Amino acid sequence: MELPAMALQSELKQDKFPSSDVPVKDKTKKITWVRVWNSTDIFHIILVGGLHVLCLSAPFTFSWSAFWLSLTLYAVCGVFGTTLSYHRNLTHRSFKLPKYLEYFFAYVGLHALQGDPVWWVSTHRYHHKFTDTYLDPHSPIEGFWFSHIFWLFDSKYILEECGRYENAGDLLKQSYYRFLERTFVFHVYLQAALLYMFGGFPFIVWGMAVRTVWGFHASWLVNSVCHRYGHQAWDTGDLSTNNWFIAMLTSGEGWHNNHHAFEYSARHGIEWWQIDTTWYVIKLLEYLGLATDVKVPSEVHKRKMSFKNCVQDKQFCVNDK
């Protein structure tokens, strides 16, 4: 099954990655390491690099208490923080929460150490606006490793190509999110101090480094792998794919072609067999009366986005809209 015809693909050869539905040609971004690095890039490389180095101590600091702490924080910060709060609630407004609960989950997300809510939401909205083009903050056509991690260390690229936080005005209007943006580093230190106080160095290694690095790469695999390897179920006009393995790692985020087809949907695992842990949590919150205005795709929208509504024209599938 080929991808829809679009301006981007007219520039790309139709070679496919192994075990992938996605035709794409890399245009590897030449990252200039010898350059003037701004404070954001320096902070990112110190934080990400430092946490990876700390992980080397994991075998020597193992304890069951540290292990279970790591697993618990990974699940809580990943599901309630990154995927439920940052992604589906704040970025896409897929459902509504009482303000106190929205703020609480956003603070939980802060401790996944993937950035403050304003930065995360702004970057992800630019990703959807410019998906798989040269303006995409972590475009796969700039090379696998750029889309996976190196984009984090080139904030000038995002500023020049996309802009700053103009697309996150709904968050910037709220003093709470401006506060988290200004004080993000403080919360990183606070987390480290509390973990050390309660469990010493092993809690730092397992409760902060191991579970955070695991969370980093799980999220980054959505950016890199899920725009290269997997299956396309919907005519999204981009390179997004569904990848069941990444979905298992990320509480449902790996159903990425579904997500790009229905960005507003709180449910990413559209089919009954597509496990989506984050969606189950949202449904529980809805049952408890805490989540309202929960959005899911209509049957009409599904038919519109289906490849069955396309007319096959040689190598391309053109929307009949």
From Swiss-Prot:
According to its record, how does it sit in the membrane?
Multi-pass membrane protein
Q: Where is this motif: Histidine box-2?
A: 124-128
Keyword entries, A-Z: Fatty acid biosynthesis, Fatty acid metabolism, Iron, Lipid biosynthesis, Lipid metabolism, Membrane, Metal-binding, Oxidoreductase, Transmembrane, Transmembrane helix
- GO CC annotations on file: endoplasmic reticulum membrane
- What is the name of this protein? Acyl-CoA 5-desaturase AL21
EC number(s) on file: 1.14.19.37
Q: Which residues bind Fe cation 1?
A: 87, 92, 124, 128, 259
> What residue intervals hold the motif Histidine box-1?
87-92
Location of the motif Histidine box-3? 256-260
Under the heading Pfam families, the entry gives:
FA_desaturase (PF00487)
Which source organism does the UniProt entry give? Answer: Anemone leveillei
Q: Which cofactor does it need?
A: Fe(2+)
Question: What is the catalytic activity of this protein?
Answer: (11Z,14Z)-eicosadienoyl-CoA + AH2 + O2 = (5Z,11Z,14Z)-eicosatrienoyl-CoA + A + 2 H2O; (11Z,14Z,17Z)-eicosatrienoyl-CoA + AH2 + O2 = (5Z,11Z,14Z,17Z)-eicosatetraenoyl-CoA + A + 2 H2O
Biological processes per GO annotation: unsaturated fatty acid biosynthetic process; very long-chain fatty acid biosynthetic process
